[in-house]
């Protein structure tokens, strides 16, 4: 046995002596061990041979990479104690030794990733792609000395959780790109501590926490829930409904008690967290009690009521935990900056100003510069007014939640992040960037966000080129970069808020646009050299082709079946990286149904022979907007064989339909047909809504519940304003005893067609 051990030791020394060495302290921390593992993994591929990891004092061969708190580093005057948790240092001692040092738990890891990026051009562009140029030499400049720390203290880009079997890859991808906050993903990402990940926000979670604070309340706390417009305090079912009564002293007491419990529980687990989030539920409800509404008048904003509530909590907790900072959100109606109130020094205001695709107070054009674009003048004022009152955290939106595919964020990203950092002095940033599969250049958007959150002074254009070369290949990159600029230029030509524009209403998305864009993609695919590069390009082709199909429905493509097949194949190739299995199955099912609908022979319109029909909307354009209540049903007498239907109501509640314009409610209309005047044949009939003026966000609805809805924004024209004035006709069928005397059918209202017709000359 003794001879075997001696032989093994000799082999180890020979192996170490035959190659460059990564040197760890004699007793390395977990972060130092991980940093060495990362170096060995990537450098081995870059230089084409193993790079061994040894402990300090073990025989090895120069050049040496000294990782962490080594005696060698200490001998050069570099003490680990001097570093902040995310601070890092690269310092060469000639060409034979390099010190990679930093703080715990992440600084030393950041030093290793900085070295890999700066000296070997190694990148992590998405969760499954690692870009490592091969055939390199392990070398550096003899006078190399770099140090730094992240620009934003808390950094998070939220893309959405993937399947559990992908969570490890996701954790590593985020950590390598120096994100330190994963929202609620922190609780399901396995053992992330080896990558330096710790909780950045304390319990209970990282968003919409009111519900967590109230979950244990009993009937005796009824007065602490928000009061509705009927004068009743109601317990919310979840965070999507209801709020709290913030003027009630008992609510303050309960929140203070719960916060203390959270702090104590976190510290018992070793999590000494600085920031705790106390934020409203995810809705725009306000407590209607007299005291809360009086506070709203006093502060000229619902935000003032919330700040007054949070101030009391901060004041109570400060006595025992003066270092704790409370983050609260200026959300929905609370987004208006208050007057006549000072904000406690330990309170930070989070600013989630949502895009104009949402109704209400939301006006922001999230794809444009806050500081420079005229569409964001109002929101810039809101941001700066809050920043005058308190330190601010940014909750940003890098995605449109409607028709997001062909709106690029590239131009606005660097402008906005630098505005938040330099002008608003924010050091906390969370960005929602969902739906990367259906977003043009989604991986680039996320990766560039990583770069600027980490280093606000990064050369943005150079970083863009670097990503393009790594992700699409140096030969295809020029075409993909030109495609990005082409789409950006087209976006810039639209004066309307992109969040309010439907796909059909976008004036920049012409058939010529798609033809030119396809040219860039075709040339890029021809230039790409590897299957991986082609796969990445085909993901962007999917976004273009799918939006082309949805807008023009193959009118510009003679080979319909081949085009539709290409879309599906590109989706199936790339979707597993970005979407859950159930989401993929749902998309494929809906896509196939949509393609079937495009091939359906629609019944001709009758009764409008002397009118000019501007738009004829049938299935599959008619689709569910309130899926729980509305169904797409097969129906032989429907114009396209399918229709939207609402049923499951047991009595007559009105034969009502209307037109709603969120941008100009005075433009809205509603009509009700008296029950006695309803046709009794249970067939489709046309009903006129009268003349309307189309806008980017307008829609029609059917039934007093509004559960049947259809957007007319697709029909809005930014270039032919005269076509926005039209008369709307709905083809509706009323069935069942609620509408037809003596009927044996179920009660149902069905919409199969919407006609927009040129108004008659007066």
Q: Language-model segments: which ranges?
A:
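Acidic, contiguous N-terminal accessory segments
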Residues: 6, 16-89, 130, 134-146
């Amino acid at each position: 046995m003794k001879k075997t051990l001696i032989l093994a030791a000799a082999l180890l020394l020979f192996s170490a002596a035959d190659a460059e060495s990564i040197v760890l302290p004699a007793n390395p921390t977990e972060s130092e061990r991980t940093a060495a593992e990362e170096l060995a993994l990537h450098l081995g591929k870059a230089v084409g041979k193993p790079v061994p990891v040894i402990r300090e004092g073990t025989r090895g061969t120069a050049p040496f990479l000294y990782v962490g708190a080594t005696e060698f580093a200490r001998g050069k005057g570099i003490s680990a104690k001097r570093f902040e948790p995310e601070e890092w240092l690269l310092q060469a001692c000639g060409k034979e030794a390099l010190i990679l040092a930093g703080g715990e738990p992440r600084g030393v890891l950041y030093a290793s990733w900085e070295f890999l990026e700066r000296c070997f051009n190694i990148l992590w562009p998405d969760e499954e792609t690692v870009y490592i140029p091969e055939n390199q030499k392990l070398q550096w400049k003899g006078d190399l000395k770099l140090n730094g720390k992240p620009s934003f203290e808390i950094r998070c880009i939220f893309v959405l959780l993937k399947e559990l079997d992908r969570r490890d890859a996701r954790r590593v991808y985020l950590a390598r790109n120096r994100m330190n906050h994963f929202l609620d993903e922190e609780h399901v990402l396995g053992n992330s501590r080896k990558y330096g990940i710790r909780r950045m926000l304390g319990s209970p979670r990282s968003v919409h926490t009111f519900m967590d604070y109230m979950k244990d309340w009993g009937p005796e706390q009824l007065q602490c829930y928000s009061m509705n417009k009927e004068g009743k305090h109601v317990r919310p079912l979840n965070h999507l409904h209801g709020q709290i009564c913030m003027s009630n002293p008992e609510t303050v007491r309960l929140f203070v008690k719960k916060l203390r419990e959270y702090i104590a529980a976190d510290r018992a687990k070793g999590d000494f967290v600085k920031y705790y989030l106390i934020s409203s539920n995810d809705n725009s409800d306000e407590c209607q009690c007299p005291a809360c509404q009086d506070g709203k008048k006093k502060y000229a904003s619902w935000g003032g009521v919330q700040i007054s509530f949070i101030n009391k909590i901060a004041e109570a907790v400060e006595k025992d935990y003066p270092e704790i900072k409370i983050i609260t959100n200026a959300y929905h109606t609370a987004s208006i900056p208050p007057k006549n109130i000072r904000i406690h020094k330990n309170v930070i205001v989070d600013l989630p100003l949502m895009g104009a695709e949402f109704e209400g107070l939301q006006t922001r054009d999230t794809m444009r510069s806050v500081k420079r674009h005229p569409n964001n003048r109002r929101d810039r004022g809101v941001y700066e007014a809050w920043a005058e009152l308190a330190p601010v955290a940014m909750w940003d939106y890098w995605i449109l939640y409607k028709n997001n595919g062909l709106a690029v964020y590239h131009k606005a990203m660097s402008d906005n992040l630098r505005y938040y950092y330099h002008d608003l002095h924010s050091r906390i940033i969370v960005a929602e960037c969902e739906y990367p599969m259906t977003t043009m250049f989604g991986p680039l958007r996320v990766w560039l966000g990583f770069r600027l959150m980490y280093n606000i002074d990064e050369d943005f254009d150079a970083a863009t080129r670097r990503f393009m070369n790594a992700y699409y290949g140096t030969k295809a990159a020029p075409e993909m970069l030109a495609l990005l600029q082409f789409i950006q230029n087209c976006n810039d030509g639209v004066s309307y808020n992109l969040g309010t524009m439907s796909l059909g209403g976008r004036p920049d998305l012409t058939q010529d646009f798609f033809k030119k864009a396809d040219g860039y993609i075709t040339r890029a695919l021809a230039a790409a050299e590897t299957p991986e590069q082609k796969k990445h390009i085909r993901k962007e082709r999917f976004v273009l082709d799918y939006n082309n199909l949805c807008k023009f429905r193959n009118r510009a493509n003679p080979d319909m079946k081949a085009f539709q097949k290409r879309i599906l194949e590109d989706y199936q190739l790339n979707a597993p990286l970005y979407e859950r299995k159930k989401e993929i199955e749902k998309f494929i099912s809906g896509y196939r149904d949509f393609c079937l609908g495009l091939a359906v022979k629609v019944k001709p319109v009758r009764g409008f022979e002397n009118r000019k029909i501007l738009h004829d909307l049938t299935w599959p354009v008619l689709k569910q907007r309130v899926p729980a209540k509305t169904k797409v049903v097969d129906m032989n007498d429907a114009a396209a064989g399918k229709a939207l239907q609402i049923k499951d109501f047991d009595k007559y509640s009105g034969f009502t339909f209307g037109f709603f314009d969120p941008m100009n409610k005075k433009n809205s209309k509603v009509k009700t047909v008296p029950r006695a005047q309803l046709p009794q044949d249970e067939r489709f009939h046309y009903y006129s809504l009268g003349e309307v003026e189309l806008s980017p966000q307008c829609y029609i609805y059917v039934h007093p519940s509004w559960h049947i809805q259809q957007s007319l924004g697709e029909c809005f024209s930014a270039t032919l304003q005269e076509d926005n004035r039209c008369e709307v006709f709905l083809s509706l069928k009323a069935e069942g005893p609620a509408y037809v005397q003596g009927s044996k059918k179920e009660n149902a209202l069905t919409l199969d067609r919407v006609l927009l017709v040129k108004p008659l000359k007066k």
